[in-house]
Amino acid sequence: MPYYEDIMEYVERVKMKLKPKLLVIFGSIAKGGFGVGSDVDILIVSDMLPKNFQKRLKILFLLNDTFAPIEPVGYTSEEFKKMISKGHPTALDAIHDGIILYKDEKYEKEIRSLFKEVIGRVRREEFGWVKV
């Protein structure tokens, strides 16, 4: 995996600061399509994230002390559950194709259960998810 050491350094910083329930690499790197100019999309689920989205992004970006092009996105555990329930493409991609870097076992089971419910209502197409 490109930037492996940098990614793991970032993961450790996030774990110390935000006590996440889930950390997942998604996007091109998870699908094996990483190339020149690609970034490293990391989904972070933590109930310690601020409600304000701009403050949330600032914290997530400031935790990256590496040269890796990390593009973090962060959600609370309830926000992420709602995203899965509604068939949000980012959430579905992260669960379907993602590489789990860290997980709370109980939370991951909840997420997988929700995903199984939703996967019966959507279908994966070449460029995204569609309702069936």
Annotated model-derived regions:
Residues 43-45:
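Short hydrophobic/aromatic beta-strand micro-patches
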